[in-house]
Design a protein with these regions (language model features):
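Generic long, charged, amphipathic alpha-helical segments
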Residues: 100-137
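Short, well-ordered beta-strand elements within core beta-sheets of diverse protein domains
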Residues: 88, 134-142
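Short, intrinsically disordered C-terminal tails of secreted or membrane-associated proteins
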Residues: 185-191
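Short, well-ordered alpha-helical segments
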Residues: 140-157
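Active-site "cap" helix and flanking loop/linker of ATP-utilizing ligase/carboxylase catalytic domains
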Residues: 2-24, 41-113
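Short arginine-rich
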Residues: 154-168
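Short beta-strand elements
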Residues: 26-30, 35-44, 120-121
């Protein structure tokens, strides 16, 4: 993907006299015919960032400052060993029309090694309620992708709102294709 999509786009912008410096997010779908680019954005993708940043060792502000000042190549960016997986909870009807205002129940204590991220939520009379199609996501970290997935799903199982649904196959393809990966390698999986 980097060689066939990202680098040609960045090099093309430089050739046109508009070199790119910053965050370039590519929405990509892998199809039987190959790579299909859905969109480019000059921002972090959400929830894609939620599966990557938990593995960053160090200060994100330092990385962004180095990028902004043209010194990113000189900055060593270190990643934690392990894996992260993110699962997205959606409202019924998403991505088409969906109801809003359903009360959301969250756990009193979050499971270890999980992070909860709000997206389509609102606070109505001191109650957290649904306010969008992608309501929230849960990221789990672990030594292996399998462990990270188990933690993400354990966190998601502790959340409830009417009509809530989420995919149960996140990372399954990665588990099969990475079955020979060594523990300690960095892996991530996310699909909404």
């Amino acid at each position: 993907i980097q060689d066939r999509v990202i680098l040609p786009v960045v090099r093309g912008m430089a050739r046109r006299g508009t070199p790119f410096q910053g965050v370039l997010y590519a929405g990509i779908m892998l199809t039987p015919k190959g790579i299909s680019v859905l969109e480019f954005n000059t921002r972090f993708g959400d929830p894609e960032t939620q599966v990557v940043l938990p593995l960053l060792k160090g200060d994100l502000l330092e990385v962004l400052t180095a990028c902004n000042t043209g010194k990113l190549a000189a900055l060593p960016i270190v990643w934690q060993a392990g894996s992260c997986a993110t699962v997205v909870a959606a409202a019924p009807g998403y991505p088409n029309t969906y109801p809003t205002g359903a009360p959301i129940t969250l756990p009193d204590a979050y499971p270890p090694h999980t992070m909860f991220f709000q997206a389509g939520t609102a606070l109505k009379e001191r109650q957290l309620v649904t306010a969008g199609g992608r309501v929230l996501s849960v990221s789990g970290r672990g030594a292996t992708l399998e462990q990270a997935l188990a933690r993400a799903y354990a966190g998601m199982d502790a959340v409830h709102f009417e009509g809530m649904h989420y995919r149960r196959d996140i990372g399954k393809t990665s588990l099969i294709s990475n079955s020979s990966a060594q523990e300690g390698e960095t892996r991530s999986a996310e699909v909404s």
